[in-house]
Amino acid sequence: MTMSLEVFEKLESKVQQAIDTITLLQMEIEELKEKNNTLVQEVQSAQHGREELERENSQLKEQQQGWQERLQALLGRMEEV
């Protein structure tokens, strides 16, 4: 009878350890989910910022091209004079 009680107590202890481990892992999973959501938002924000910078870069290149064309036209007129 004593042997059965010892085995039961050991089993109970192992079950409790398993429950504690599962609880800790569930908490860790929740923390990781929150971190993942934060990182997803940061990535989306960075992508949005990159898209804006690419648009701005494109506009600046167009403006530069326009100024270069005007400058070439002015230099052409100066050579004619």
Curated annotation (Swiss-Prot):
Pfam assignment, any one: ZapB
Keyword Coiled coil: yes
GO BP annotations listed: division septum assembly; FtsZ-dependent cytokinesis; vesicle-mediated transport
Annotated region described as Disordered, given as residue ranges: 43-64
Classification via InterPro entries: Cell_div_ZapB (IPR009252), SNARE (IPR010989)
Record localization: Cytoplasm
Gene Ontology cellular-component terms listed: cytoplasm; membrane
Keywords (A to Z) from UniProt: Cell cycle, Cell division, Coiled coil, Cytoplasm, Septation
Record field: compositional bias (Basic and acidic residues): 48-59
Coiled coil region boundaries: 5-81
Function: Non-essential, abundant cell division factor that is required for proper Z-ring formation. It is recruited early to the divisome by direct interaction with FtsZ, stimulating Z-ring assembly and thereby promoting cell division earlier in the cell cycle. Its recruitment to the Z-ring requires functional FtsA or ZipA.
Subunit relationships: Homodimer. The ends of the coiled-coil dimer bind to each other, forming polymers. Interacts with FtsZ.
Family: Belongs to the ZapB family.
The name this protein goes by in its record: Cell division protein ZapB
